[in-house]
């Protein structure tokens, strides 16, 4: 049984979840460039290179834990008009994410994802303390899987390449309170909708090659949270720290992808790859960001934790504004 089980392609169980989580890495960077780094000019270009890593743990039988490390570049262009906080912009980024599965053979998957989007920001008062932002983006991805599985006492290999694409829309409304000269508190609420599609996956090389039916996911993710910010200036340099806590819940169909596979190049029946359980308890996430910059260049460090998947993550970045 163990031999058959090893061949069943459990690595494909939550492909949709990994595609989404790779996109979320870029989303975090776009948010960071927009929110954490106030601009002096009305017309700004911000660019950041970043690296991040984390892990995902699960108790669901048939779904494999993994670690990931990603790096990439994110860019945001914003035009602000005369009224503070009102503006439009566009953003783009690319991320390369490597997943290392904690299975017997140490399978590996690599995702390359690019995203481009537009945003609009609307203030509801003079000093932009209450602000609504809507953004929409599209993404495309190219992924490779190297599946390694144990049969009796020998490691077998199978390799595949597949593609992803999708579209997302996010609404966020937030209100900033100034607590003192250095401290601010910003409670916010957001709703992100995303549809993603995964192409047919057909393993080209290796033994016991599988074919996985093309599939999709639909994400409806409300989020509510608050950010405590601190700023301190040393002449031209600024230190900014943000501590954020948020609750989000996935109401769509992402984790349990209901993927189906069969042995490739045969007329064998499709079998179900058992997916992750859809966790409706939601996720509580904690984030600490620290940035040091002069008006043009900056370095950033961040650490975060998600209760869902017990994901402890951390990252570093370099950013430039021009």
Regions found by a protein language model. Name each.
Residues 189-192, 244-245:
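A glycine-rich phosphate-binding loop feature that marks nucleotide/adenosyl-phosphate handling sites
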Residues 113-115, 211-322:
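Outer membrane beta-barrel transmembrane domains
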Residues 185, 192-196:
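Solvent-exposed flexible segments
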Residues 1-177, 300-317:
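Outer membrane beta-barrel translocator domains of Type V secretion systems
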Residues 61-66, 102-109, 144-163, 197-218, ...:
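Solvent-exposed, glycine/polar-rich loop segments of beta-barrel outer-membrane systems
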């Amino acid at each position: 049984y163990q031999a058959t089980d090893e061949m069943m392609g459990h690595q494909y169980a939550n492909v949709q979840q990994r595609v989404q989580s790779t996109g979320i890495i870029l989303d975090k960077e776009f948010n960071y460039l927009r929110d954490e780094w106030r601009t002096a000019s009305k017309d700004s270009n911000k660019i950041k290179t970043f690296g991040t890593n984390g892990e995902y743990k699960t108790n669901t039988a048939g779904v494999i834990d993994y670690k990931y490390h990603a790096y990439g570049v994110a860019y945001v262009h914003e035009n602000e008009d005369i009224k503070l906080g009102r503006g439009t912009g566009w953003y783009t980024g690319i991320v390369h994410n490597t997943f290392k599965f904690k299975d017997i053979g140490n399978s590996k998957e690599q995702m390359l994802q690019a995203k481009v989007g537009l945003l609009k920001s609307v203030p509801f008062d003079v000093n932009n303390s209450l602000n609504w932002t809507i953004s929409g983006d599209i993404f495309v991805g190219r992924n490779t899987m190297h599946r390694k599985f144990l049969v009796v006492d020998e490691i077998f290999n199978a390799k595949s390449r597949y593609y992803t694409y999708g579209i997302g829309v996010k609404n966020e409304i937030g209100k900033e309170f100034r607590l003192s000269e250095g401290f601010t508190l910003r409670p916010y609420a957001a709703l992100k909708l995303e549809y993603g599609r995964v192409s047919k996956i057909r393993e080209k090389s290796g033994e016991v090659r599988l074919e996985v039916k093309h599939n999709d996911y639909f994400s409806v993710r409300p989020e509510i949270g608050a950010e405590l910010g601190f700023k301190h200036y040393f002449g031209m340099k600024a230190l900014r720290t943000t501590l954020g806590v948020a609750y989000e819940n996935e109401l769509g169909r992402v984790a349990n992808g209901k993927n189906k596979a069969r042995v490739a190049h045969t007329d064998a029946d499709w079998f179900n790859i058992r997916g992750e359980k859809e966790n409706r308890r939601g996720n509580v996430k904690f984030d600490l960001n620290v940035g040091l910059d002069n008006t043009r260049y900056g370095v950033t460090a961040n650490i975060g934790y998600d209760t869902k998947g017990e994901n402890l993550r951390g990252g570093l970045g370099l950013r430039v504004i021009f």
